[in-house]
């Protein structure tokens, strides 16, 4: 399973790259707004650091505007993937962009039928938001499982990016289910590497070493 980093913070991305954990990056307008600098510069800087897909989201809600923005974004770097919202206008934009060879990531997916429609429109990636479903007392990972089943039924090659990840369990479940990608906030990524028994083991080794050197 590929690890994408869900952030626009260049320092977090660089740390993830050093760990070998940044197969790609996903951004959105909210993440971009947290950083200093203009949108295009931030995206270019991310592309310079990461050797993998970088999702940049359009702001327009109408098909023509989405396509216009997407074409401009696609000129910034060859690794750019255009994030398109899961709407009727978004599906039209995805179809048009796919015909022009521009990769897309359909975002804000909350049902398996939305994911199927995105794939049929020609999406390169689809992003089910598991954490937001969990917030509504639903099980977001059930959605991922359903999408995987549907895609497997029809040999659909659209990749599934498990998004809105809130904790390590989401990542574990995504891996066990066979999702293509988990896009992970940097704070959650660090938690994946941690375990109390690892810390206790290190402390024990160091204490034993100190005793042996006396």
Curated annotation (Swiss-Prot):
CDD domains: Transaldolase_FSA. It catalyses: D-sedoheptulose 7-phosphate + D-glyceraldehyde 3-phosphate = D-erythrose 4-phosphate + beta-D-fructose 6-phosphate. The keyword Transferase applies. InterPro entries: Aldolase_TIM (IPR013785), TAL/FSA (IPR001585), Transaldolase_3B (IPR022999), Transaldolase_3B/F6P_aldolase (IPR004731), Transaldolase_AS (IPR018225), TSA/FSA_arc/bac (IPR033919). GO terms for molecular function: aldehyde-lyase activity; transaldolase activity. Keywords: Cytoplasm, Pentose shunt, Schiff base, Transferase. Gene3D superfamilies: Aldolase class I (3.20.20.70). GO terms for biological process: carbohydrate metabolic process; pentose-phosphate shunt. Its EC number is 2.2.1.2. SUPFAM superfamilies: Aldolase (SSF51569). Pathway: Carbohydrate degradation; pentose phosphate pathway; D-glyceraldehyde 3-phosphate and beta-D-fructose 6-phosphate from D-ribose 5-phosphate and D-xylulose 5-phosphate (non-oxidative stage): step 2/3. One of its GO terms (cellular component) is cytoplasm. PANTHER family: FRUCTOSE-6-PHOSPHATE ALDOLASE 1-RELATED, TRANSALDOLASE. Belongs to the transaldolase family. Type 3B subfamily. Transaldolase is important for the balance of metabolites in the pentose-phosphate pathway. HAMAP family: Transaldolase_3b (MF_00494). This is Probable transaldolase.
């Amino acid at each position: 399973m590929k690890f994408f980093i869900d952030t626009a913070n260049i320092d977090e991305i660089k740390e993830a790259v050093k760990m070998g954990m940044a197969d790609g990056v996903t951004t959105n307008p909210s993440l971009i707004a947290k950083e200093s600098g203009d949108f295009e510069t931030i995206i270019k800087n991310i592309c310079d650091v990461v050797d993998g897909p970088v999702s940049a989201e359009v702001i327009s809600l109408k098909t023509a505007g989405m396509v216009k923005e997407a074409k401009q974004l696609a000129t910034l770097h060859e690794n750019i993937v255009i994030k398109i919202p899961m709407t009727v206008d978004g599906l039209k934009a995805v179809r048009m962009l796919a015909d022009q060879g521009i990769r897309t990531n359909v975002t804000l997916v909350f049902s398996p039928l939305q994911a199927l429609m995105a794939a049929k429109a020609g999406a390169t990636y689809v992003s089910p938001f598991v954490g937001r479903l969990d917030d509504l007392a639903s099980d977001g990972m059930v959605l991922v499982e359903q999408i995987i089943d549907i895609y497997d039924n029809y040999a659909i090659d659209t990749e599934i990016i498990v998004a809105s990840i809130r904790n390590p369990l989401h990542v574990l479940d995504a891996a066990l289910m066979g999702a293509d990608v988990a896009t992970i906030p940097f704070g959650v990524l660090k938690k994946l590497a941690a375990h109390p028994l690892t810390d206790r083991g290190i402390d024990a080794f160091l204490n034993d070493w100190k005793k042996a050197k006396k």
